[in-house]
Amino acid sequence: MAKEPARVKKRERKNITSGVAHVNASFNNTMITITDAQGNTISWSSAGAMGFKGSRKSTPYAAQMAAEDAGKKAAEHGVKTLEVNVSGPGSGRESALRALQAAGMTITTIRDVTPIPHNGCRPPKRRRV
């Protein structure tokens, strides 16, 4: 007797009006996660998840596409206002912010939460190209 295929539960719509967008812009990729005030993930996207590979993931355009995607997914759950936490040294920081605004989100605060060492670990040696 064949097993009946398991039914995939449809993701229910959360009615959340405000959230927190965490933009992590590294040198290699840009990741955007939109959470509620408690930190539970509502939606996420990254340059790699949008189909960019290799060095194209670190471009501002890839960050813009990822932010638009995360913003649209969050808007389906009712998110209208966002606080933005930006971390990392990558090139996709500003373009991700502009794309979130273009997706119809109202940005209330922008915080730079990049971790800065108080002379902690020794950094990697300089590249010689």
Curated annotation (Swiss-Prot):
Keywords: Ribonucleoprotein, Ribosomal protein, RNA-binding, rRNA-binding. Belongs to the universal ribosomal protein uS11 family. HAMAP family: Ribosomal_uS11 (MF_01310). One of its GO terms (cellular component) is ribosome. NCBIfam families: PRK05309.1, uS11_bact. PROSITE patterns: RIBOSOMAL_S11. The keyword Coiled coil does not apply. This is Small ribosomal subunit protein uS11. Pfam families: Ribosomal_S11. GO terms for molecular function: rRNA binding; structural constituent of ribosome. Part of the 30S ribosomal subunit. Interacts with proteins S7 and S18. Binds to IF-3. InterPro entries: Ribosomal_uS11, Ribosomal_uS11_bac-type, Ribosomal_uS11_CS, Ribosomal_uS11_sf. Located on the platform of the 30S subunit, it bridges several disparate RNA helices of the 16S rRNA. Forms part of the Shine-Dalgarno cleft in the 70S ribosome. One of its GO terms (biological process) is translation.
